């Protein structure tokens, strides 16, 4: 059981984790912008793309066997949960942590402005019916109807979608996040319907040592909707 990696360029290793329902192909449009400065390492998470299902410990061991000793790590949406857990458990390997429209807890509760679990359940049901149509509509909504030609290479497995749904509903790193001392940044989109921008105010209070960036006109995919701003932020953060 091998994790599928796709590498581009030379330089500081930058590992990218995709979000739920997608695979590493979602990063393809920004590779030309990152490749001159970084060695980009795209990862298909378990049950997505070309990576088979596996549990967390198998994923971590398999991944670390294929990665450099130290690297910067960026996770988008659900991928941010994977990235955060990796940084909490293996801080000696992760030099920088970048969370893109992600948070330590996705589901809302009485004192946390996440999203209702029904949103993910509905998305899951739509994905199960017509994955390409659902993903294209999702991207169109997040990019405010901006044209983006996304071709999904390998549809996620039903097990991958279900496991991802469980992760989004149950993983909660709000307490463990206080242990993180590596440089960490959280990126939010003011128009994001999935990771509400008001999460940022709570996080700034609870985790004052982290950096926070708000994309005023972005929704859930600022790396595609505002690529130039996103690349500038990455270059300023990763020294």
Curated annotation (Swiss-Prot):
Gene3D superfamilies: alpha/beta hydrolase (3.40.50.1820). GO terms for biological process: biotin biosynthetic process. Keywords: Biotin biosynthesis, Cytoplasm, Hydrolase, Serine esterase. It catalyses: 6-carboxyhexanoyl-[ACP] methyl ester + H2O = 6-carboxyhexanoyl-[ACP] + methanol + H(+). The active site is at residues 77, 192, 220. Its EC number is 3.1.1.85. It is found in: Cytoplasm. It holds the Pfam family Abhydrolase_1. InterPro entries: AB_hydrolase_1, AB_hydrolase_fold, AB_hydrolase_sf, BioH. Pathway: Cofactor biosynthesis; biotin biosynthesis. Its main location: cytoplasm. Substrate binds at residues 20, 77-78, 138-142, 220. It is an enzyme of class 3 (hydrolase). GO terms for cellular component: cytoplasm; membrane. GO terms for molecular function: pimelyl-[acyl-carrier protein] methyl ester esterase activity. Monomer. HAMAP family: Carboxylester. The physiological role of BioH is to remove the methyl group introduced by BioC when the pimeloyl moiety is complete. It allows to synthesize pimeloyl-ACP via the fatty acid synthetic pathway through the hydrolysis of the ester bonds of pimeloyl-ACP esters. Belongs to the AB hydrolase superfamily. Carboxylesterase BioH family. This is Pimeloyl-[acyl-carrier protein] methyl ester esterase. It comes from Legionella pneumophila (strain Lens). The gene is bioH.
């Amino acid at each position: 059981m091998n994790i599928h990696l796709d590498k581009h360029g030379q330089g500081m290793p930058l590992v990218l984790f995709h979000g739920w329902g997608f695979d590493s192909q979602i990063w393809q449009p920004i590779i030309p912008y990152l490749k001159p400065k970084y060695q980009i390492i795209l990862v298909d998470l378990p049950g997505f793309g070309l990576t088979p299902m596996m549990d967390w410990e198998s994923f971590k061991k398999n991944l670390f066997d294929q990665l450099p000793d130290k690297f910067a790590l960026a996770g988008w949406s659900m991928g941010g949960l994977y990235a955060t857990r990796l940084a909490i458990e293996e801080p000696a390997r992760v030099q920088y942590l970048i969370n893109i429209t992600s948070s330590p807890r996705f589901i809302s509760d009485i004192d946390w402005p996440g999203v209702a679990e029904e949103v993910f359940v509905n998305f899951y049901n739509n994905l199960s019916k017509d994955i390409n149509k659902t993903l294209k509509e999702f991207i169109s909504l997040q990019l405010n109807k901006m044209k983006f030609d996304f071709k999904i290479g390998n549809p996620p497995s039903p097990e991958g979608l279900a496991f991802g749904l469980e992760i989004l509903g149950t993983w909660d790193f709000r307490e463990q996040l206080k242990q993180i001392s590596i440089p960490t940044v959280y990126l939010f989109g003011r128009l994001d319907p999935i990771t509400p921008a008001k999460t940022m105010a709570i996080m700034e209070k609870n985790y004052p040592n982290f950096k926070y960036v708000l994309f005023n006109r972005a929704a859930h995919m600022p790396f595609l909707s505002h690529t130039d701003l996103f690349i500038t932020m990455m270059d300023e953060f990763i020294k």
